[in-house]
């Protein structure tokens, strides 16, 4: 496909984006808004953002959800801006500096919350800064400006949603159904690999792919939930399927690890059974029926615990899968599965990364302020706004440097494109609303196609072009003002990119160490006799951390294996029949405190000291288990965990 070719699958969204822009433009001028540009810009960003992220037309609900987040972020930013102005109107410089800190604070929060919701906080940060900068000449008009900005943004969002609904957005339900079938087959094939106990790298690749696919399925569940309330039952089932899929991965990998030391546990009966190849979900269904009969014949005691648990989880998965596909009423058996253990939320391991993002945003905004005051440039305020926008939006993404480059390319492309519209097209179409709408529809259509291709600079070009062309009421054509705005955007993006390069993010290794120590803490916390604590479902949170580790350190197999071993240890100890007595309960609390100290330690010396203390306590704990005559189901996992911690002590403690 050529660089300028248009694929059929890209046309519908391009028309949708053009429609959203035209609707916002028409409504903005019809209601005599002072700056319809904000409504048009909002409609374009809300519609194009999810398409750029998805690399194609977004699924149903994505644009609507992004619109709601933008409304929330705008209102938070407007309220914050009003509070800052009211409190510091007599000290303009201090007021702007506080706004810079507010933008940094919002970026810090957006780095810690779920990636889907971080957009609202990033928006809240730079909205307050936009209000404070814009009202500098006339501070008394602040409330009016805040209300107008909120109104224009809401109009733009409504127009984007209307355009989305008008062109019947894609439903993700069929993709979910197909993935559920395919995922079950992949789970069975992973168990086959683990029972064969073949090449470790092949097994590592297989379970790594399954972790990614299960995480992707969880993202699909979020999309399905946003799409319509009629999928509420399917959403409940998919949430439980997420845990079951992770359980299947854990049991398969534990089956592989057990054979490293005790291969005789997997009998020839099960080895021969899992030799049969499967290609479809129907094949898996037949094999599971046979497998349940084999287990009933051999007895639970003669069946390895990992295979028994795997079959139980796969059977539940099948039952819920049928319910998701048919979306029928939840029956009593399903309800029993869905009333599972409460999920545990873990503390973010990226606090240092979030603090780096805070300083990047704050320092870049302060640098923009100093540049504005030092030069006295009329478009310094525009540069300030672009700095805040780039840093607030870039920091929450995995590669902020590339986002900043995208904005630089976009603002550079917007200069000639905006010049064409400013000097030729808009002056010749402003007398006709129809011609004006057609001209902007053409812009939206072609940039909409490029956005879906994820062309570098396409998203920045769309937003920057709309921002600098004259879409005010009434329209005024001052070339110097246009040039200042265009150059201000470019300078702002370059300054933001410079700060991102200078303030380096060296938090990757620290985040990796914190994640690994959180796995250790989770395994240690599973050693408890507290009934409520044992019922907590840590599995989704642990695999979410593992997925983050895989993204931070792609290809680092030793780290992944260590993390997976800790997850397996957690699951095995959680179900182990630990003797119930006060002596062991008190020691469990002591080990949990020590594990927490390992995570919170700020220096390598303290971390090594607490880790050594934890290893000593585990040795004492093993002795206590022997005294209290704990069964092998308890002593063996604890012994394996202690051995792993001794083996990887340096990786878990040294920077």
Swiss-Prot record:
Membrane spanning stretches: 13-33, 38-58, 69-89, 93-113, 121-141, 152-172, 370-390, 407-427, 431-451, 459-479, 482-502
Tell me the GO molecular function terms: transmembrane transporter activity
The way it spans or sits in the membrane comes to:
Multi-pass membrane protein
UniProt keywords (A-Z) are:
Cell inner membrane, Cell membrane, Membrane, Transmembrane, Transmembrane helix, Transport
- Pull one GO CC term from this UniProt entry: plasma membrane
Primary location class: membrane
| Superkingdom, taxonomy of origin | Bacteria
Claim: Transport is one of the keywords in the record: yes
> Where does the record say this protein resides?
Cell inner membrane
Q: Name one GO biological process term.
A: carboxylic acid transport
Instruction: Tell me, using the record's free text, what induces this protein.
Output: Positively coregulated with aaeA and aaeX by AaeR.
InterPro entries assigned to the protein according to its UniProt record, in alphabetical order: PHBA_efflux_AaeB/fusaric-R, PHBA_efflux_pump_AaeB
Paired cysteines (S-S): none
Q: What is the recorded function of this protein according to its Swiss-Prot or TrEMBL entry?
A: Forms an efflux pump with AaeA. Could function as a metabolic relief valve, allowing to eliminate certain compounds when they accumulate to high levels in the cell.
Q: Which HAMAP family match?
A: AaeB
Q: Which family does it belong to?
A: Belongs to the aromatic acid exporter ArAE (TC 2.A.85) family.
Q: What is this protein called?
A: p-hydroxybenzoic acid efflux pump subunit AaeB
């Amino acid at each position: 496909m050529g660089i300028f070719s248009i694929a059929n699958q890209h046309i519908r969204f391009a028309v949708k984006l053009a429609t959203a822009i035209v609707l916002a433009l028409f409504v903005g001028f019809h209601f005599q808004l002072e700056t319809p540009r904000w409504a048009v810009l909002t409609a374009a960003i809300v519609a194009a953002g999810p398409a750029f992220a998805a690399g194609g037309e977004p699924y149903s609900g994505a644009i609507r959800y992004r619109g709601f987040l933008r409304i929330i972020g705008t209102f938070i930013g407007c309220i914050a801006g009003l509070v800052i102005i009211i409190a510091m109107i007599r000290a303009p410089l201090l007021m702007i500096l506080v706004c810079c800190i507010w933008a940094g604070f919002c970026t810090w929060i957006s780095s810690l919350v779920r990636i889907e919701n971080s957009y609202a906080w990033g928006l809240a940060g730079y909205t307050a800064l936009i209000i404070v900068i814009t009202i500098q000449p006339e501070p008394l008009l602040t409330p009016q400006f805040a209300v107008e900005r909120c109104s224009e943004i809401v109009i733009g969002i409504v127009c984007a949603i209307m355009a989305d609904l008008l062109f019947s957005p894609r439903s993700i339900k069929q993709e979910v159904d197909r993935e559920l079938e395919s995922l079950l087959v992949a789970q069975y094939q992973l168990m086959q690999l683990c029972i064969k106990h073949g090449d470790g790298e092949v097994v590592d690749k297989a379970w790594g792919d399954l972790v990614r696919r299960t995480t992707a399925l969880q993202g699909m569940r979020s999309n399905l939930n946003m799409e319509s309330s009629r999928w509420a039952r399917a959403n409940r089932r998919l949430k439980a399927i997420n845990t079951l899929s992770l359980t299947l991965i854990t049991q398969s990998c534990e089956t592989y690890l057990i054979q490293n030391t005790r291969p005789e546990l997997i009998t020839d009966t099960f080895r021969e059974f899992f030799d049969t190849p499967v290609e479809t979900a129907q094949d898996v269904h037949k094999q599971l029926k046979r497998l349940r009969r084999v287990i009933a014949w051999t007895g639970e005691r003669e069946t390895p615990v990992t295979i028994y648990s795997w079959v139980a989880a796969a059977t539940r998965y099948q039952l819920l899968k049928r319910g998701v596909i048919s979306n029928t009423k939840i029956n009593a058996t399903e309800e029993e599965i869905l009333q599972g253990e409460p999920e545990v939320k873990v503390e973010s391991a990226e606090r240092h990364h979030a603090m780096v993002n805070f300083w990047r945003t704050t320092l870049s905004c302060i640098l923009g302020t100093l540049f504005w005051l030092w030069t006295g440039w009329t478009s310094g305020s525009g540069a300030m706004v672009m700095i805040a926008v780039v840093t607030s939006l870039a920091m929450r993404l995995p590669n902020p440097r590339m986002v900043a480059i995208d904005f630089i390319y976009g603002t550079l492309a917007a200069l000639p494109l905006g010049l064409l519209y400013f000097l030729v097209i808009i002056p010749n179409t402003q007398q006709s609303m129809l011609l004006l709408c057609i001209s902007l529809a053409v812009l939206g259509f072609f940039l909409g196609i490029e956005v879906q291709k994820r062309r570098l600079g396409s998203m920045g070009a769309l937003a920057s072009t709309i921002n600098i062309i004259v879409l005010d009421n009434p329209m005024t054509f001052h070339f110097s003002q246009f040039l200042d705005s265009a150059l201000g955007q470019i300078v702002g993006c370059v300054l933001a990119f410079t700060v991102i390069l200078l303030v380096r993010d060296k938090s990757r290794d620290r985040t990796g160490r914190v994640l690994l120590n959180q796995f250790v803490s989770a395994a240690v916390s599973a050693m408890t006799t507290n009934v409520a604590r044992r019922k907590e479902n840590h599995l989704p949170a642990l695999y979410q951390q593992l997925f983050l580790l895989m993204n931070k350190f792609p290809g680092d197999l030793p780290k992944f294996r260590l993390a997976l071993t800790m997850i397996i240890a957690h699951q095995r100890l959680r179900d182990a029949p630990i003797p119930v007595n006060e002596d062991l309960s008190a020691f469990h609390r002591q080990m949990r405190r020590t594990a927490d100290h390992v995570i919170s330690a700020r220096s390598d010396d303290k971390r090594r000291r607490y880790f050594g203390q934890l290893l000593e306590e585990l040795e004492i704990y093993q002795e206590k288990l022997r005294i209290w005559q704990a069964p092998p189901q308890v002593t063996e996992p604890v012994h394996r965990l202690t051995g792993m911690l001794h083996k990887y002590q340096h990786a878990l403690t040294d920077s």
